[in-house]
Amino acid sequence: MGQRLVVSVQNNGRELATIYYHWSAYTVSALYETETLVKCIFNHKDETEEELKLRLIRFCYENGGGIMGDHFEFEYIRSLYPNEIFKEDGYSRSYGLISISEQGMRESHKWSEGDVIIHIDEERISNGVFGYWDNIQEYNEEVASWGPGYEDDIKVFEDVPDIGYDLGDIEIKDIGKVIKAIENANEHIVRYGNEIYELTE
């Protein structure tokens, strides 16, 4: 079983699509998948949400993924785009399985072990694929509660690298910079100001 990531694409508070990745609910992997989706969404101008959904479906297929779930989702998508040809097999759940029906999106969320939301209208990303503590004291208290053998995990605040970005609320334009900041830190415990993040690895 993988670490299962679900990326939700939303506009004006409405969910348009979910994309499921079977092995990507790790902090950096999730951000890379999200960055690729962001480029797909924002590097083109769609006249309607239906056009955007179709482009996301094509994006999944082009990258080795496909349509999520059972025959219902496939038939639902085919009914919306009768002039398109969608293959029912030969794709991988590791490369993105899309749902756009209400039922399909609900089912996709049930599998999630890590969630990211792309807010198109706000040009922001809500990221939940990391551990969080309000401050270093809370983090160290939790580590101490784990018992003997975890002494090396206790951190001195000044030794924790500040990545300079809120990992839970990212502006679309900054996602590449956030990834680079995390990779440059080269630590699994990082911070933004006083907030402590544990990267899921």
Predicted regions and their residues:
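Short, extreme N-terminal segment that most often corresponds to the first beta-strand
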Residues: 1-33
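N-terminal interaction modules that seed assembly of large macromolecular complexes
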Residues: 28-33, 37-44
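Low-complexity intrinsically disordered segments
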Residues: 39-201
